Curated annotation (Swiss-Prot):
E.C. no: 7.3.2.2
The protein's name: Phosphonates import ATP-binding protein PhnC
This protein's UniProt keywords: ATP-binding, Cell membrane, Membrane, Nucleotide-binding, Phosphonate transport, Translocase, Transport
InterPro entries: AAA+_ATPase (IPR003593), ABC_transporter-like_ATP-bd (IPR003439), ABC_transporter-like_CS (IPR017871), ABC_transpr_PhnC (IPR012693), MetN_ABC_transporter-like (IPR050086), P-loop_NTPase (IPR027417)
Keyword tRNA processing in annotation: no
Residues the record lists as binding ATP: 37-44
GO cellular component, one term: plasma membrane
Span of domain ABC transporter: 4-248
Origin species: Staphylococcus epidermidis (strain ATCC 12228 / FDA PCI 1200)
Length: 257
């Protein structure tokens, strides 16, 4: 049984734009799967449909054999606990401390009123500190998040996702706003988490070099359709040209040196 399965999934927006068209795709446990394609190809729509940030129009998506598409209420909350999310723009509470931001990864486990009052049990704080140590910013735990660099803020986001104790992490263009050196550090963190903890990574990336360097698998989308799914080791220039429908530009190859 695949960890994530897309079954005939389509997404049509209210304005008639087709975001996804008849997607059939299996993501296996432990994959580091990179989604690539032009802007507007459906990468974010595909990624965000996994945890229902975007609802699909047709088909079904299952997590560990259970339909998240049909899940409601407590069942949906329970399924979302296992899916961490990392965004391009970090989505941190800038005035809060690093530790408090990471602890927000535990909100799905406790009543809302306790989270508003900051009543996190000791066990949660231990989990949060462990997550910060894993991404090498434990020493920043008591600083305000907006006092840190972009790369450090993205590492807070990764730690927050880890604090959730997920089996899957979705990463939506997590390095798009970072410089090359910081990009490498963040991608190294994600790869280490994938390899050491066995957490499945499903990630959107703009740079094809990064996709080949870090991915175990490449998923190519064009105009909402799945046009490639195969090992990263087999994804050569011809494959990427097919995915993009044209030759790859230099600024799409800028990756880790």
């Amino acid at each position: 049984m695949s960890q994530i399965e897309f079954k005939d999934v389509s997404k049509v927006y209210p304005n008639g734009h087709v975001g996804l068209k008849d997607i059939n795709l299996n993501i296996e446990k432990g994959d580091f799967a990179v989604i690539v394609g032009l802007s507007g190809a459906g990468k974010s729509t595909l990624l965000r449909s996994v945890n229902r940030l975007h609802d699909i129009s047709k088909g079904d998506i299952t997590i560990e054999g259970q339909s998240i598409t049909k899940a409601r209420g407590k069942k949906l909350l329970e399924m979302r606990r296992s899916i961490g999310m990392i965004f391009q723009h970090f989505n941190l509470v800038k005035r809060s401390t690093v530790l408090r931001n990471v602890l927000s990864g535990r909100v799905g486990y406790h009543p809302t009123w306790k989270m508003i009052l900051g009543l996190f049990p000791k066990e949660d704080k231990v989990k949060a500190l462990d997550a910060l140590e894993r991404v090498n910013i434990l020493d920043k735990y008591d600083q305000r998040s907006d006092q840190l660099s972009g790369g450090q803020q993205q590492r807070i986001s990764i730690a927050r996702a880890l604090c959730q104790e997920p089996t899957i992490i979705l990463a939506d263009e997590p390095v798009a706003s970072l410089d090359p050196l910081t990009t490498k550090q963040v991608m190294d963190d994600l790869k280490k988490i994938n390899e050491e903890l066995g957490i499945t990574i499903l990630i959107n990336l703009h740079f094809v070099d990064l996709a080949k360097e870090y991915g175990s698998r490449i998923i190519g989308l064009r105009a909402g359709e799945l046009v490639y799914d195969g090992p990263a080791s087999e994804a050569n220039d011809e494959v990427f040209n097919h995915i993009y429908g044209r030759s790859i530009k230099d600024d799409e190859k800028l990756g880790v040196e």
